[in-house]
């Protein structure tokens, strides 16, 4: 596996839509030769559509009406070939009858050699004219590829042969007959899987650890039970599209032996596949699987199958008596076509041999580096910076006469917390680059906001080292600059945290993460508002009487004492609440 595991991205990122070659607009000139859609599925064997022609003989220059018809289909590709050399290039050109549903294609730099659809709407009939070239082969056969769904299509459906008047009789080439293969049977599961024998007879991968799919629909469950020279596999997970797992030599995606259970309407298609990097999985024959069964209930997809431990004839199937990392992913699908999953796959912490001693293991959906990045940023921008700001803004008078290392205590506390914030940010900033090996292009605005926060976090302590003396005229400018940079950093950091929680590399539980972050913001703003109101009311208690220009301060000492106690209580309560919110996020990170 050569490509780094996506953080967002995937086991079966394999399941990336961006890599799927599907053309709803019908512009498929690259398919002119083989006429095979690049859908990574096997074509159907028995055609249910037909091609008819308006005449069975032709001369060069004739225009023949060709009709493709049958049950509703969404896409098609129509060509004329030399009937005695169907693998040869397209012959002649086409003229459109309905330009809303069909269009001419350019093949081998010649316009009009083929016709395809213009849109993916359902259609039951397409009519075009074929213009016979001069010179022309003695016999012509039309071929059509028809797409009903993404994974249901027919390739090179033949038409009756049309011939020139004086041509020798057409002889159908002898076809090499192949024995018909009966597709493997698929049954319906009557009850959900159970985790009862996990660790005894079954090797199980579960998330949350020790969950039971029989009792918990949200349980991600994968089990392997050895039976002589085969392994029975059970897979279950909440999804409306597909669930999948893969065996991998490392924790990066690519070159993996994967298996998908894809929902199609009210059935499930069980499909072995092979992952090559971040591209769409290459679907393989189901002939390697036996005893296939599936079940749909309560938003959960469950499927099972049996596979031999060794498959010498199957190129991309791994032997199962070796150790691998195990991936589990789920995501959306439509008409049998799978799409990129929104969160990282579950990946076991180490390699396991599923045919060895039965165990019950778990995994993680996030890299330890990304977990550390998120945890450090939460500590820095939820806790240390927030407490540091409150101390500097509201507690100067409380600890103005207390000193620590020859500086006011409030200032030393503020400075230590802010230095801690900058150091935590610097360490956390590096971790995603180490994990990704560079810039993360799929992370949206989060990395840009993160770079901005990093810049401000470094700039802020540098500005503080040039702080002018207390009575210096430049002190006012410094104060405003210092406040502006700090406030901007905090606002951008909160925005970055909101976005980062949704990235595939972390993807904390929804909607709890949003409520928790909103709760933290309200908690902090509410605390600042309370302290501001208190400061205003305290100033109102100090009555200034102007009598012969002599100021008399009434009860100043008592008011200040009362104010200091109140502020300390508010700070203690705030820190407790802050730590609770921080613990919620750190716990969520630990459990993904």
From Swiss-Prot:
Entry EC number(s): 1.-.-.-
| GO annotation (BP), single | intracellular iron ion homeostasis
Tell me the GO molecular function terms.
metal ion binding; oxidoreductase activity, acting on metal ions
* Stored CDD domains: Cyt_b561_FRRS1_like (cd08760), DOMON_SDR_2_like (cd09628), Reeler (cd08544)
Disulfide-bonded cysteines = none
Q: Which GO CC annotations does the UniProt entry carry? A: membrane
Regarding tissue, the record states:
Expressed in spleen, liver and kidney with low expression in brain. Localizes in adult brain to the choroid plexus of the fourth, third, and lateral ventricles and to ependymal cells that line the ventricles.
| Residue ranges annotated for the Reelin domain, each copy included | 13-179
Sites carrying sugar chains: 85, 308, 321, 353
| Cofactor: how and how many bound | Binds 2 heme b groups non-covalently.
Annotated ranges, domain DOMON: 216-331
> Where would you say this protein principally sits, based on its record?
membrane
What cofactor does its activity depend on? Answer: heme b
* InterPro entries according to UniProt: Cyt_b561/ferric_Rdtase_TM, DOMON_domain, Ferric-chelate_Red/DefProt, Reeler_dom, Reeler_sf
What topology in the membrane does the UniProt record assign? Multi-pass membrane protein
Protein's cellular compartments: Membrane
The entry marks the following residues as binding heme b 1, namely 373, 446
Tell me where in this chain the Cytochrome b561 domain is found. Answer: 335-534
**Chain residues that bind heme b 2:** 414, 482
Q: What induces it?
A: Down-regulated in kidney and liver of mice lacking hypotransferrinemic (hpx), which have iron overload of the liver and pancreas.
Sorted keywords for this record are: Electron transport, Glycoprotein, Heme, Iron, Membrane, Metal-binding, Oxidoreductase, Transmembrane, Transmembrane helix, Transport
Question: What PANTHER family does this protein's entry cite?
Answer: CYTOCHROME B561/FERRIC REDUCTASE TRANSMEMBRANE (PTHR45828), FERRIC-CHELATE REDUCTASE 1 (PTHR45828:SF3)
Its biological purpose is as follows: Ferric-chelate reductases reduce Fe(3+) to Fe(2+) before its transport from the endosome to the cytoplasm.
Report the family membership. Answer: Belongs to the FRRS1 family.
Protein name, entry field: Ferric-chelate reductase 1
Source organism (scientific name): Mus musculus
């Amino acid at each position: 596996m050569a490509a780094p595991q996506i953080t967002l991205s995937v086991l079966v990122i394999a399941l990336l839509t961006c890599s799927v070659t599907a053309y709803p607009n019908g512009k498929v000139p690259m398919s002119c030769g083989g006429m095979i859609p690049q859908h990574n599925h096997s074509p159907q064997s028995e055609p249910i559509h037909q091609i008819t022609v308006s005449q069975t003989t032709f001369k060069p220059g004739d225009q023949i009406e060709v009709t493709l018809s049958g049950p509703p289909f969404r896409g098609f590709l129509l060509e004329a070939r030399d009937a005695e050399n169907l693998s040869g290039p397209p012959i002649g050109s086409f003229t459109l009858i309905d330009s809303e549903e069909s269009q001419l294609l350019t093949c081998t730099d010649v316009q009009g050699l083929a016709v395809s659809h213009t849109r993916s709407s359902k259609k039951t009939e397409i009519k075009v004219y074929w213009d016979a070239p001069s010179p022309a082969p003695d016999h012509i056969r039309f071929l059509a590829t028809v797409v009903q769904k993404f994974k249901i299509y027919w390739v090179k459906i033949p038409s009756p042969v049309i011939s020139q008047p004086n041509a020798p009789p057409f002889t159908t080439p002898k076809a090499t007959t192949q024995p018909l293969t009966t597709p493997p049977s698929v049954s319906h599961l009557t009850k959900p899987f159970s985790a009862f024998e996990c660790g005894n007879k079954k090797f199980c991968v579960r998330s949350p650890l020790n969950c039971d799919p029989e009792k918990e629909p949200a349980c991600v469950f994968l089990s392997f039970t050895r039976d002589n020279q085969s392994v029975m596999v059970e897979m279950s997970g909440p999804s409306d599209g597909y669930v999948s797992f893969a065996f991998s030599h490392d924790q990066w995606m690519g070159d993996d032996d994967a298996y998908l259970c894809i929902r199609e309407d009210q059935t499930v298609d069980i499909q072995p596949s092979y992952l090559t990097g971040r591209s769409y999985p290459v679907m393989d024959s189901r002939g390697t699987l036996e005893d296939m069964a599936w079940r749909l209930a309560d938003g959960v997809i469950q499927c099972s199958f049996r596979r031999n431990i060794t498959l010498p004839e199957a190129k991309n199937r791994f032997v199962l008596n070796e150790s691998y990392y195990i991936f589990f992913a789920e995501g959306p699908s439509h008409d049998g076509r799978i799409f990129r999953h929104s969160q990282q796959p579950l990946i076991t912490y180490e390699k396991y041999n599923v045919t060895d001693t039965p165990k019950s293991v778990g995994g993680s959906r996030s890299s330890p580096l990304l977990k550390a990045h998120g945890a450090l940023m939460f500590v820095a921008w939820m806790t240390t910076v927030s407490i540091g700001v409150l101390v500097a803004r509201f507690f100067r008078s409380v600890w103005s006469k207390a000193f620590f290392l020859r500086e006011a205590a409030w200032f030393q506390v503020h400075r230590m917390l802010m230095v801690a914030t900058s150091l935590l940010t610097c360490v956390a900033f590096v971790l995603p680059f180490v994990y990704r090996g560079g810039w993360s292009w799929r992370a949206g605005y989060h990395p840009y906001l993160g770079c901005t926060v990093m810049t401000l976090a470094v700039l802020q302590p540098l500005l503080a080292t040039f702080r002018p003396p207390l009575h210096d005229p430049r002190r006012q400018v410094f104060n405003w600059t210092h406040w502006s940079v700090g406030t901007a950093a905090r606002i951008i950091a909160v925005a970055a945290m909101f976005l980062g929680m949704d990235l595939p590399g972390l993807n904390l539980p929804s909607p709890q993460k949003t409520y928790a972050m909103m709760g933290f913001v309200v908690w902090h703003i509410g605390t600042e508002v309370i302290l501001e109101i208190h400061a205003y009311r305290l100033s109102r208690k100090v009555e200034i009487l102007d009598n012969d220009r002599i100021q008399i301060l009434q009860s100043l000492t008592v008011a200040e004492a009362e104010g200091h106690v109140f502020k300390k209580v508010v700070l203690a309560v705030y820190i407790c609440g802050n730590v609770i919110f921080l613990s919620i996020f750190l716990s969520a990170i630990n459990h993904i």
